[in-house]
């Protein structure tokens, strides 16, 4: 359910685009992201940094799209977001010796430090790739194709990446039999 909630602005963007076009979809995405943050704040009393970053980007790039009536800006937003994620993962690891992936997953997995570093680097590389893929589709195909890719392509790529990551990490996961021994 959280997965769908996280996709709420993207799904509304997609539906609105199909009916009313890119500018209405952009306005709806801005409003939906504000609503999403309001709901998270109401339910949990705090909002993740990642969601705040997404809000700032959708407001900046979305507003530029609407004010200038130029869809180029909204097409850049996913790439900038993905590249910020990649940079945050790499900078936190290299400079601050903090592995955000380990912080998020340490309750589910116990891994040797070099493996955590590889997992962190693979997520950073994946986000960098996603940013590049977004720009490739955005500026080499129609806006309609880009909107479809933004929802279905990104979800598909994420699913494939998570499955591959799970396969890579499966040898480190303890089975119930291992835990009983």
Curated annotation (Swiss-Prot):
Signal peptide residues on this chain, from the entry's feature table: none
Keywords: Cell inner membrane, Cell membrane, Membrane, Transmembrane, Transmembrane helix
Pfam families: IspA
Keyword Cell membrane in record: yes
Compartment(s): Cell inner membrane
Residues spanning the membrane: 3-23, 49-69, 76-96, 119-139, 149-169
Membrane topology, from the record: Multi-pass membrane protein
Domain of life: Bacteria
Gene Ontology cellular-component annotations: plasma membrane
NCBIfam families reported in the protein's UniProt record: ispZ, PRK00259.1-3
Family statement: Belongs to the YciB family.
Function: Plays a role in cell envelope biogenesis, maintenance of cell envelope integrity and membrane homeostasis.
PANTHER family noted in UniProt: INNER MEMBRANE-SPANNING PROTEIN YCIB, INTRACELLULAR SEPTATION PROTEIN A-RELATED
HAMAP family reported for this sequence: YciB
Protein name per Swiss-Prot or TrEMBL: Inner membrane-spanning protein YciB
């Amino acid at each position: 359910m959280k997965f769908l909630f996280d996709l709420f602005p993207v799904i509304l963007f997609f539906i609105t685009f199909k009916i009313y076009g890119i500018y209405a979809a952009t306005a709806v995405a801005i409003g939906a992201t504000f609503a999403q943050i309001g709901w998270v704040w109401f339910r949990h009393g705090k909002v993740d940094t990642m969601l705040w970053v997404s809000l700032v980007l959708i407001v900046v790039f979305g507003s530029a799209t609407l004010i200038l009536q130029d869809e180029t800006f909204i097409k850049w937003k996913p790439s900038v977001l993905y590249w910020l994620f990649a940079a945050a993962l790499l900078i936190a690891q290299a400079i601050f010796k903090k592995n955000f992936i380990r912080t998020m997953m340490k309750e589910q997995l116990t891994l040797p430090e070099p493996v955590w570093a590889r997992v962190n680097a693979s997520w950073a590389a994946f986000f960098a790739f996603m940013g590049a893929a977004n720009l490739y589709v955005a500026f080499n195909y129609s806006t309609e194709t880009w909107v479809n890719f933004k929802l279905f392509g990104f979800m598909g790529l994420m699913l494939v990446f998570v499955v591959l990551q799970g396969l890579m990490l499966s040898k480190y996961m303890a089975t119930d039999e291992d835990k009983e021994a």
